[in-house]
Regions:
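Catalytic cores of histone-lysine modification enzymes
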Residues: 11-14, 18-50, 54, 222-257, ...
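Aromatic/acidic cage segments in peptide-binding pockets
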Residues: 86-96, 102-128, 280, 315-335, ...
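Acidic, Ser/Thr-rich intrinsically disordered and amphipathic helical segments
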Residues: 104-112, 195, 199, 205-207, ...
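C-terminal interaction modules of eukaryotic adaptor/scaffold proteins
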Residues: 445-479
Length: 479
């Protein structure tokens, strides 16, 4: 006998303006062929480029419903509280579309979004058991010193909160894309591009998806090697590799190649366009007692979700040697891939392989290891003569001191909640990846966003920086 199913509407509990989810009796499905008309009315007021709420509640504002399902065998059921803390392994969630169709998987929802030409993308839908779909945390408005540090350049507003004093962050130019005064060649004629019409859902036929997959195979990605030992086909492997429903849980150290400006696929709905479509999480810049400025999230973020990219001015090592060393990140994807050709590659974990990005942050003012070498070795006195960007051995650096995005405020933690992924969009040059940050676990509302600076303690004589992360596995020192 089939299992009984009990549906419980899931309501949110936080804030004075909770998300409205209507009762189960409304929106009953009537048999029809789904088309853009199914979402036209529900989405008429939805503006994808202006997000003012928890992004994972956006479907509710566009006519979607969300239900807690309990399945019980032996023809009986028992009602459970609709809270994520009590969900058992036999529970699930059900999304109901504006036209009344019910979906149990994100694959089904993704197909529906394509079929209806919806403004929503799959990244706004959640299928894990721990992410709470609640309105954003509200902090005391009297301590908000500035409404939006991005000055309208992001899809979201990021307020500045300081309950310790009236100080604001040091001034800088906010930008969402890396910029540079350098002149270097970017041969786009050799870039992979696609002409997909299915939002690039058929990965085995999308050249961009295949580029990511083939590069990973070429560099002996551990995940792919394991699948090959299980005799999985390329088609079976590629559908479970890299972005899954626009989330990245396992980093791809050989790089991810997103669809680009030459591709004919949809610029917003494409399943292989994520990092390029900007920040969509609700964040707040706040002042701490021990670490200066920090960044926290105002709602739960599911594991694998994209946060944003590290943005700055692109400079050479020689130029960096003359700069005030703050907010630096080294782009070293090319030498990283070269290093993986040694025979010890397979002994390294995926996480360790990704730790090729070193940063110099905020008040620390400490040059990273690569920059120390450039300080000692460079003989060039004129920054204008540093036009060696075409040198295959050159290394480039992002400087976010005077120009950057909100990511310039990320602090260090020995137990980080974000990981780094090198992504290639409008350049396939291995020296110019986009440094993207993804949630490496579920992040709770109010939690500070941190990454691991990965400094080597003792690499700088006579310099000691104690760690302030207070994590259970804290290493005690940054340097």
């Amino acid at each position: 006998m089939a299992d009984s199913i009990f549906l419980t509407p899931v309501f949110v509990s936080r804030s004075s303006s909770p998300v409205s989810i209507r009762s189960f009796s409304s929106n009953v499905h009537q048999s029809h062929q789904c088309s853009p008309h199914c979402v036209l009315t529900a989405e008429e007021n939805f503006i994808p480029d202006c997000i003012i709420q928890n992004p994972y509640t956006l479907p509710f504002s566009c006519g979607w419903k969300y239900f807690h399902i309990d399945r019980y065998a032996k023809d009986r059921f028992k009602k459970k509280p609709s809270t994520r803390k009590t969900i058992s392994s036999r529970s699930n969630y059900l999304y109901r579309s504006p036209c009344g169709r019910s979906f149990l998987t994100l694959d089904e929802i993704e197909q529906y979004l394509l079929q209806t030409n919806s403004k929503l993308t799959i990244k706004f839908f959640v299928d894990d058991r721990t992410t709470r779909l609640e309105s954003c945390i509200k902090y005391e408005s009297k301590y908000i010193l500035y409404d939006d540090i991005t000055q309208g350049k992001e899809y979201v507003r990021i307020p500045v909160y300081n309950e310790n004093n009236s100080n604001l962050p040091e001034s800088f130019i906010y930008g969402t894309e890396t910029r540079s005064k350098l002149i270097f060649s970017n041969d786009t004629t050799t870039m992979t591009c696609c002409s997909c019409t299915d939002n690039c859902r058929n990965r085995i036929k999308c050249p961009c998806w295949l580029k990511t997959f083939e590069q990973a195979k070429l560099n002996e990605n551990e995940q792919i090697l394991n699948w090959q030992r299980q005799n999985l086909s390329d088609e079976q492997m590629i559908i479970r590799f890299a972005y899954i429903h626009q989330r990245l849980k396992i980093p791809v150290w050989s790089g991810i190649y997103e669809c680009n400006s030459k591709c004919l696929c949809h610029t917003k709905q494409c399943t292989n366009r994520l990092v390029q479509n900007s920040l969509y999480q609700q964040l707040q810049l706040f002042h701490t007692n021990t670490k200066g400025w920090a960044l926290r999230v105002l709602h739960d973020i599911p594991y694998g979700s994209f946060i944003n990219a590290y943005v700055g001015e692109l400079i050479t090592e020689q130029m960096a040697a003359k700069r005030d060393f703050k907010y630096l990140a080294i782009l070293d994807h090319k030498s990283h891939l070269t290093a993986t050709n040694n025979k010890n590659r397979k002994e390294s974990s995926i996480k360790n392989k990704l730790d090729d990005v070193r940063i110099l942050h905020a008040k620390n003012r400490i040059p990273v290891k690569c920059c120390i070498r450039s300080l000692n070795d460079t003989q060039t006195d004129n920054e204008d003569d540093d036009n060696d960007e075409d040198d295959d051995d050159s290394c480039f650096i992002l400087d976010a001191k005077h120009y950057g995005s909100i990511s310039r405020f990320y602090n260090h933690s020995c137990k980080p909640n974000v990981h780094i992924q090198n992504v290639f969009i409008n350049s396939h040059n291995p020296r110019f990846p986009v440094i993207a940050l993804f949630a490496c676990r579920n992040i709770r509302a109010g939690e500070e966003i941190c990454w691991d600076y990965n400094y080597s303690v003792g690499c700088m004589p006579n310099v000691r920086i104690d760690c302030q992360c207070q994590a259970s596995n804290c290493r005690g020192r940054l340097l």
